[in-house]
Amino acid sequence: MRSPASTPSIRGGAFASSPILRHNHLPFLRLNPPSSSPTRSSPPSIQCSVQFRPCIDIHKGKVKQIVGSTLKDLKDDDGSDPITNFESDKSAAEYATLYKQDGLKGGHVIMLGADPFSKAASLEALHAYPGGLQVGGGINSDNCLSYIEEGASHVIVTSYVFNNGQMDLERLKDLVRIVGKERLVLDLSCRKKEGKYAIVTDRWQKFSDVSLDAKVMEFLANFADEFLVHGVDVEGKKLGIDEELVALLGKHSPIPVTYAGGVTVMDDLERIRTAGMDNVDVTVGSALDIFGGNLAYKDVVAWHNQQKVSVA
């Protein structure tokens, strides 16, 4: 069981077979959180079991698996291409339909670029599975509501709420005002820097001044329904999970949190369940056979279903 929030203030076979703030200085903790924020007397946010959260990463309109640390922000593009682990011949909508058929909710569609092809593909996925997918990539106050209207359950934001490496609280509050806390996911993806997990923005290329820790998660939980955290140092490399990061999330996140990065074998799912104290959901990308890897998607779905049985 996930403990309640206590603080006020991210292959063919499966298709065939399936039917802010600077670290330690929280300058706006003095400010009142939005009216929809949890309080000590609020009903607890409970998740009954660890879940597998599927993903659809879209780059130039195609479903791909990319080594996240090789992505470039468009305005800083030097002409080099990111390292691509896999490019699918299936559409984003086909993946969405697969996840819908298998009863997998809360997966994320990420647009790895601002091109119109990626946006069109993401909308096709949302239309194929209305209410079942979250969407991120270029989300801001001008377009966030439109994605909800197109069928997204939540919008995922990171770079928009940072400015020069610090959290822009006014932007964050605007998003809450427009779509509501209950439809907002904060992407707190991070990389290790000087022994701490620094939140990274702009396609994971820029370090913010914000380190992911208990106080930061406690505060930001007032403005979001969930967190999504990619372990960027291991993401897309199939080198194993960042167990230290998973443990940090499991111990300190007061709201549902999903970890992504480095899952290679089934044992990694159990390691996440254990290190995260049954509080951390998991996304698997490049390792899955539906994305060209060796880990059977059907086995991961079976593991997901077993988690629900275990707590029934």
UniProtKB/Swiss-Prot annotation:
Recorded metabolic or biological pathway in which this protein acts: Amino-acid biosynthesis; L-histidine biosynthesis; L-histidine from 5-phospho-alpha-D-ribose 1-diphosphate: step 4/9
Cellular compartments annotated: Plastid, Chloroplast
Source organism (scientific name): Medicago truncatula (Barrel medic)
For biological process, the GO terms are: L-histidine biosynthetic process
Q: Which residues are noted in the entry as 5-[(5-phospho-1-deoxy-D-ribulos-1-ylimino)methylamino]-1-(5-phospho-beta-D-ribosyl)imidazole-4-carboxamide-binding?
A: 65, 108, 138, 158-159, 187, 204, 236, 262, 285-286
Residues folding into a coiled coil are: none
Record-given protein name = 1-(5-phosphoribosyl)-5-[(5-phosphoribosylamino)methylideneamino] imidazole-4-carboxamide isomerase HISN3, chloroplastic
Q: Which GO terms describe its molecular function?
A: 1-(5-phosphoribosyl)-5-[(5-phosphoribosylamino)methylideneamino]imidazole-4-carboxamide isomerase activity
Q: NCBIfam families in the record, alphabetically?
A: hisA_euk
Supply the EC number(s).
5.3.1.16
The UniProt keyword set, sorted, is:
Amino-acid biosynthesis, Chloroplast, Histidine biosynthesis, Isomerase, Metal-binding, Plastid, Sodium, Transit peptide
Query: Which positions form the organelle transit peptide?
Result: 1-67
> Which residues are listed for Na(+) 2 binding in this entry?
159, 162
**PANTHER family on file:** 1-(5-PHOSPHORIBOSYL)-5-[(5-PHOSPHORIBOSYLAMINO)METHYLIDENEAMINO] IMIDAZOLE-4-CARBOXAMIDE ISOMERASE
Q: Which Pfam families match?
A: His_biosynth
Q: Highest lineage ranks of the organism?
A: Eukaryota, Viridiplantae, Streptophyta, Embryophyta, Tracheophyta
Q: In UniProt terms, what function does this protein have?
A: Component of the histidine biosynthesis pathway that catalyzes the isomerization of 5'-ProFAR (pro-phosphoribosyl formimino-5-aminoimidazole-4-carboxamide ribonucleotide, referred as 1-(5-phospho-beta-D-ribosyl)-5-[(5-phospho-beta-D-ribosylamino)methylideneamino]imidazole-4-carboxamide) to PrFAR (phosphoribulosyl formimino-5-aminoimidazole-4-carboxamide ribonucleotide, referred as 5-[(5-phospho-1-deoxy-D-ribulos-1-ylimino)methylamino]-1-(5-phospho-beta-D-ribosyl)imidazole-4-carboxamide).
A single Gene Ontology CC term: cytoplasm
According to its UniProt record, this protein's enzyme class is isomerase
Catalysed reaction(s) here are:
1-(5-phospho-beta-D-ribosyl)-5-[(5-phospho-beta-D-ribosylamino)methylideneamino]imidazole-4-carboxamide = 5-[(5-phospho-1-deoxy-D-ribulos-1-ylimino)methylamino]-1-(5-phospho-beta-D-ribosyl)imidazole-4-carboxamide
Residues bound to 1-(5-phospho-beta-D-ribosyl)-5-[(5-phospho-beta-D-ribosylamino)methylideneamino]imidazole-4-carboxamide are 57, 68, 138, 158-159, 187, 203-204, 230, 236, 262, 285-286
* Note describing how the cofactor binds: Binds 2 sodium ions to optimize substrate binding.
Transmembrane region(s): none
